[in-house]
Amino acid sequence: MKLQTTYPSNNYPIFVEHGAIDHISTYIDQFDQSFILIDEHVNQYFADKFNDILSYENVHKVIIPAGEKTKTFEQYQETLEYILSHHVTRNTAIIAVGGGATGDFAGFVAATLLRGVHFIQVPTTILAHDSSVGGKVGINSKQGKNLIGAFYRPTAVIYDLDFLKTLPFEQILSGYAEVYKHALLNGESATQDIEQHFKDREILQSLKGMDKYIAKGIETKLDIVVADEKEQGVRKFLNLGHTFGHAVEYYHKIPHGHAVMVGIIYQFIVANALFDSKHDINHYIQYLIQLGYPLDMITDLDFETLYQYMLSDKKNDKQGVQMVLIRQFGDIVVQHVDQLTLQHACEQLKTYFK
């Protein structure tokens, strides 16, 4: 499947298929040099997939740490200095091969190297179906995730579904959170459909039918980011579950998607409190348990610690914390939420696990 962005200009293709990696060679021929920034774990398992590409004299491989460990100033400077030592030009390309963190990092390198060079995303996880599309790139600060970054469109996104076959279950769980988030944004019918399809751990682990839901998730995100590239309006909806989720991820060091799922439940609790919504919290908790999400850490959540992180969320303004909330399916809002409501929601969340 080939999708295409529909901006007024500077559009890019998104290839979503088994064997999509074959498209890379077509692009490499257009660049004077290419630097493949590859996650150390992906390199360990899939190095042979890139042998043909690396046979090109003008292609270099740079192995970087896996996950969020790579999104540091130190790694950023080290990588830039190495690339600059090869006398690059603006017709150089940075190719990100790995999960969402790899794409974030490599994209920020591409955006800032010579004020912008070509950038190709080659996501290898389910989670990265979300982050590889839309142009958000960046690194982390000691103050929180993704606070230093840019909006930078890739030249192409090449999503080879063959990479998913070897994902450990923890990464399947983490990635599924973003797939599920897109279903929630699409409404009650889409949510019921995906819950009925992936109804337990066994089916989720098999990845049966995942291709369809990944493609639908990408289409959902494209519709939103083309309408609001710089996150001034509806693109904020894509942060569903992330205000609280990022805080949980940062302080409890759990996978991104696991934390987002906790954040999704949390926002349902907040929506019930603010709007008298009738979301069935037990339903969502039981669904996550059926899928195998480890939720024991919820009893250890410390609101004061998490709140300090939430205050740094990029959606906030001078009035305080803003959250994306599902008031009702099909009625999504970005809402200021006061500290007391946030605290009560955290306390209520914990009561479900006592």
UniProtKB/Swiss-Prot annotation:
Q: Which GO terms describe its molecular function?
A: 3-dehydroquinate synthase activity; metal ion binding; nucleotide binding
GO biological process per UniProt: amino acid biosynthetic process; aromatic amino acid family biosynthetic process; chorismate biosynthetic process
Gene behind the chain = aroB
Q: Entry's Pfam families?
A: DHQ_synthase, DHQS_C
The organism of origin for this protein: Staphylococcus aureus (strain MRSA252)
What UniProt keywords are attached to this protein's entry? Amino-acid biosynthesis, Aromatic amino acid biosynthesis, Cobalt, Cytoplasm, Lyase, Metal-binding, NAD, Nucleotide-binding, Zinc
Binding-site residues for Zn(2+), renumbered to this chain: E178, H242, H256
Task: Kindly tell me the pathway this chain contributes to.
Answer: Metabolic intermediate biosynthesis; chorismate biosynthesis; chorismate from D-erythrose 4-phosphate and phosphoenolpyruvate: step 2/7
SUPFAM superfamilies registered for this protein in UniProt:
Dehydroquinate synthase-like
Q: Which cofactor does it need?
A: NAD(+); Co(2+); Zn(2+)
Function as written in the Swiss-Prot or TrEMBL entry? Catalyzes the conversion of 3-deoxy-D-arabino-heptulosonate 7-phosphate (DAHP) to dehydroquinate (DHQ).
Q: How is the cofactor bound?
A: Binds 1 divalent metal cation per subunit. Can use either Co(2+) or Zn(2+).
Q: What is this protein called?
A: 3-dehydroquinate synthase
